[in-house]
């Protein structure tokens, strides 16, 4: 009968601590191994395929996961935040190391984290990069606005000063040399980022399936663009992994809004250790959604009056997230609502 093993790996930048336990939990080996793929595979070569290997979902886990999964090991990903709490309660230690990870997996107490398939992870990376470039561009544009404000240029004759006509306006401004060079430098960077964004978008359109039914559903939400819809689908993954809207809200960090009744709404703080990409998209979309959805606009005004505009935007983002949960679960398009909360348009199912 083949011996049963449980392996835990505490991943560091240059090395990993690798612990091997037997079926009874006895530590057979616990040593430091350099993060060199051939060395790691050589060290693990005595163990049979499908041997469970547990890693924490920390920065840089992907290469290790791919390496070991590609060589027949069964990968388990642990939730870093929860693993310490469970370790304290079950095996009486607050030290999360390779042995701890292996013990938690062996005893079925491991708090698992979602392990996306490589193709989903690659799609996320592609879409996240585009989003980061868009944010960089937005930051540079804000810097130009700040420079112009320093020189008393507070009002513009055009709506978009970064379009063709707007660029002509910027070129015509009589700015001192130091400010002119600053504006021109930022514009040059914006042009470079524009090029990279277009290049990324071309790659996304060629690599990500255009007929993504889930993304098409999310496009019916006011304020959600094509690329935002794709990123939401990639970040959320299979909606079935969330048993309730509350679990999805916890995953995205939009748990601060709790409707106690029709008349009371509590606004708490956002969870920082959560999916910031989904959270960012929905908070950005909230501004557009309240302009299109009468029900959301009424809700926004009510919260803004009591708690302020920023918390109202987060509350709207939370409502959008709950809608997304049921849209994906039930294959439904988005429904606009009357100020009373009742459906304004009923699209039914697709």
Task: Map each language-model feature to its residues.
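Short glycine-rich, Thr/Ser-proximal phosphate-binding strand/loop in the N-terminal lobe
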Residues: 17-38
